[in-house]
From Swiss-Prot:
Main location: secreted
Higher taxonomy: Eukaryota, Metazoa, Spiralia, Lophotrochozoa, Mollusca
Propeptide: 22-40
Domain-related comment: The cysteine framework is XXVIII (C-C-C-CC-C-C-C-C-C).
Name recorded for this polypeptide: Alpha-conotoxin Lt28.1
């Protein structure tokens, strides 16, 4: 096989091996982007988010989100947050 044909064959096969090794790209998830945007808006002033992660009962924020200290209400037995926007 001539060098040019061999080089073209390698160039065709190489990307296939790379895709197989890495796997397909993860599906786009708008919810993750919304959570990340919400955190950038509301969580930047909190250095340790751990105490505030359980603060919000909203599904959008639960586990991944947090409340800013000034809007988090911990006066009752559990902390609560206003609804996520």
């Amino acid at each position: 096989m001539p060098k040019l044909e061999m080089m073209l064959l390698v160039l065709l096969i190489l990307p296939l091996c790379y895709i197989d090794a890495v796997g397909p790209p993860p599906p786009w998830n708008m919810e993750d982007e919304i959570i990340e945007h919400w955190q950038k808006l509301h969580c930047h002033e909190i250095s340790d988010l751990t105490p505030w992660i359980l603060c919000s009962p909203e599904p959008l924020c639960g586990g991944k989100g947090c409340c800013a200290q000034e809007v988090c209400d911990c006066s009752g037995p559990a902390c609560t947050c206003p609804p996520c926007l």
